[in-house]
Regions:
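Extended, folded cores of ATP/NTP-driven motor/assembly subunits in large transport
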Residues: 1-317
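P-loop NTPase motor domains
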Residues: 24, 167-168, 182, 187-191, ...
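Hydrophobic anchor at the beta1->P-loop junction of P-loop NTPases
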Residues: 355
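Conserved lysine of the Walker
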Residues: 363
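Hydrophobic positions on the alpha1 helix immediately C-terminal to the Walker A/P-loop
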Residues: 366
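Post-Walker A helix-loop "phosphate-sensing" segment adjacent to the P-loop in P-loop NTPases
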Residues: 373-383
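A short helix-turn-beta junction within AAA+ P-loop NTPase domains corresponding to the substrate/partner-engaging
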Residues: 399-403, 613-626
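Conserved P-loop NTPase
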Residues: 641-692
Length: 692
């Protein structure tokens, strides 16, 4: 529990926001304490091969490992990473020296004098094995008791719940499953031999019955059952790809005291018994049991249980996808396992994503939780485009900047602003010119947009303005819409005058709010663009201007080594206009190279799924949060994302704040709900009654 809290909790920094960090920690700790499990589980797979020489063994092992990594990707997007020596030794040290700092360093080890042995770095200083049912293990900084048990009895029908239950115990428990598969020839030979043995027993029993004057066919039930089961197994091996596997399940329990050890072992036995199995202590074989526990693929124990491959597959512990990424944000608990979800969007192919859900499904609440975790614990910059005034209170509380964008305010954001210091390979003047042409097309182009001649004239005039601006050394005074109007007017031809006249209402008329130099601070770490006052033809244009300003900010942040996060609420509005849709798609595609993560938020799932560009963005995103959906939208999302019926149930008919989360290639059901009350909850909540 302490290790998990250390990954989740925020440190105080001494600024005015520390009371929010403390509230965040209170909510996170309360969430962790309320879920069914607070365990950190490490799952490893050790593969061993036997060949005639070391070179052949290495080649065989490499091929087998590559094949296994590929195959495991198909198990609910299970991501397997091959461990190097340092990581293998760390695993050993966690079992043999729990609580001690792991001190192995590959470079220092290679240059140590003499012949150093890695065993000296992971083995305990002493092991007292005089007690036949437990070991007393001691090292420099740790002393603990250890008992190894094995699952001696398995039921006729196995369940995958056994390993899951054991790893969920709040104790130091190591579960090792040894599987030694036989080839098909060995499997058939073993079945034939067992079948012959049972037949001999049946013949002996019949002779005994005759001597006693009994019916020769009156056989004990166990013999008849064995014969029937062996016949079924023989037929199954002949007709399918089934093979036999020798197996044993070993369970190691560690504790600081005898009392704690006995309690933990009783809990282990209770979990095993609940699955119709039996667990026994390895009396007089504790050292061998400890060896079998370690991730070495070495099993010196003589006991085994022979299973078919189908039965053995049930024991594989990769049944529940978990997301616990280093330096990740806390997103609540895994709805299936109860374990915490820590995800780091920065560590994936791209940081872009979407939050989708019906009205009242908890979209803005969930997004605010992520923003708070990001803003309070990192130096990243957060920008929100807010058409419904959902994020103003959060920005104000965190000392952010709220910029109201509308025609009637004194706030001015210049759509012609350009950043010339772009260290990318592209030409900033060319890129900005394309953006301005798109914005002008959205503003005065109507439904069909600008025709090629009009587009060419606007392109030429904008390019002229920026070329002169760059040749003059840039500076504070940027080109404006007035300058573009004058440049078009100076063209003299009919089309240029038409375009200049079309711009007039946005230069001197009632809708001239975007004409002039930018007069607001755009350097705050948390900026909310309030676009609720935009309507009519200015809505699309205004949102495009904001996106363009965001891109300018992203360029500056990239130069300063700072990551930017853009949240676009009701992002489907961008797809109502061809120019706006193209602009949003462009920034979405370029985001990764500039350290930008774009998050689209909407309840209009059906609308965006009708658009091919939006569908491609959704299907290629590394981050999705699917909150409660109606049946129609849920079906469409399942088809697009190839989701199963089981996954579908996690985002249909669920409570606000619950849903299905995609991070990388993993899909995890999540529960992000927090109890009402506290400073952050009041900032997150958008419920009318709670907001009063």
């Amino acid at each position: 529990m302490r290790e998990i809290l250390a990954d989740v909790m925020m440190d105080e920094t001494g600024d005015s926001l520390d009371h929010y960090r403390l509230d965040y920690n209170r909510l996170a700790q309360g969430k962790l304490e309320s879920v069914s499990r607070n365990t950190s589980t490490v799952k490893t797979l050790t593969v061993t091969v036997r060949e005639s020489d070391e070179q052949a063994a290495v080649a065989s092992l490499n091929a087998l490992c590559n094949n296994l990594v590929s195959q495991m990707r198909s198990i609910d997007a299970c991501k397997a990473t091959r461990l190097d020596r340092e990581h293998r030794l760390r695993l050993m040290a966690e079992v043999l020296r729990p609580g001690e700092e792991f001190r192995f360093d590959e470079r220092r080890f290679e240059h140590q004098p003499g012949k150093p042995d890695t065993k000296d770095l992971v083995c305990p200083w002493s092991i007292d094995a005089r007690n036949p049912t437990m070991l007393d293990i001691e090292s420099l900084d740790s002393k603990y008791l250890h008992r190894t048990m094995w699952v001696s009895g398995l039921p006729p029908e196995l369940s995958d719940q056994l390993v899951n239950d054991l790893t969920g115990l709040r104790a130091r428990v190591d579960v090792s499953i040894h599987l030694a598969p036989m080839d098909r020839g060995e499997s058939m030979t073993l079945v034939r031999r067992k079948n012959a043995e049972v037949k001999m027993q049946i013949m002996d029993q019949r002779r005994t019955n005759r001597k006693q004057g009994l019916d020769p066919d009156d056989l004990p039930d166990d013999l008849a059952d064995q014969q029937e089961q062996l016949g079924q197994l023989r037929d199954e091996l002949r007709s399918t790809n089934q093979r036999l596997v020798d197996s044993i399940i070993v369970i190691g329990v560690s504790a600081a005291s005898q009392e704690e050890l006995e309690v933990a072992c009783r809990n282990v036995k209770a979990k095993v018994n609940a699955q119709s199995c039996t667990a026994e202590s390895l009396k007089f074989m504790q050292m061998e049991g400890l060896t079998a526990e370690l991730p070495l693929g070495n099993n010196p124990l003589p006991m085994k249980r022979t299973l078919t491959t189908n039965s053995a597959a049930i024991l594989i512990p990769f049944t529940t996808q978990e997301v616990f990424e280093p330096h990740g944000l806390f997103y609540g608990s895994n709805a299936r396992s109860g374990n915490p979800i820590l995800a780091d969007r920065r560590s994936h192919m791209n940081s872009n994503g979407f939050v989708l859900g019906t009205s009242g499904g908890g979209k803005s609440f969930t997004v605010k939780q992520e923003i708070a975790g990001m803003f309070l614990n990192r130096d990243d910059e957060v920008i929100v485009i807010d058409p419904e005034r959902e994020y103003l209170a959060l920005a104000a509380a965190f000392g952010g900047q709220i910029i109201q964008i509308s025609a009637g305010t004194g706030t001015r954001v210049n759509p012609m602003d350009i950043v010339l210091e772009d260290d990318s390979a592209s030409d900033p003047v060319k890129d900005k010119t394309n953006n301005v042409v798109s914005m002008i097309g959205a503003l005065i182009g109507g439904i069909d947009g600008l025709d090629p001649l009009q587009k060419g004239l606007v392109d030429q005039c904008v390019s002229n303005l920026y070329t002169r601006y760059r040749n003059q050394g840039g500076g504070v005074v940027q080109p404006t819409l007035q300058d573009l109007h004058d440049e078009l007017q100076a063209g003299g031809d009919q089309v240029s005058r038409y375009l200049a006249d079309a711009l007039n209402p946005y230069i001197t008329g009632s809708m001239s709010g975007f004409n002039g130099q930018t007069n607001v601070d755009l350097s705050n770490r948390f900026t909310v663009f309030d676009v609720s006052g935009l309507s009519g033809e200015l809505r699309t244009f205004g949102m495009m201007v904001v996106i363009d300003q965001v891109w300018n900010r992203v360029i500056r942040n990239k130069a300063n080594g700072r990551r930017t996060w853009l949240y676009v609420d009701e992002f489907h509005r961008f797809f109502s206009n061809q120019y706006a849709a193209a602009q949003f798609k462009d920034i979405y595609k370029r985001a990764r190279k500039y350290g930008l993560g774009v998050t689209g938020i909407t309840q209009n799932v059906e609308e965006i799924l009708d658009l091919q560009d939006a569908r491609e963005m959704l299907s290629n995103s590394d981050f999705l949060m699917l909150l409660s959906q109606n049946s129609t939208d849920a079906d469409a999302l399942c088809e697009l994302l190839t989701l199963s019926e089981e996954q579908r149930q996690y985002f249909t008919g669920v409570l606000p704040g619950q849903g299905l989360m995609k991070i990388g290639s993993a899909y995890v059901p999540f529960d992000g709900r927090i109890p009402a009350g506290g400073d952050l909850y009041r900032l997150y909540s958008t419920t009318f009654q709670e907001g009063k």
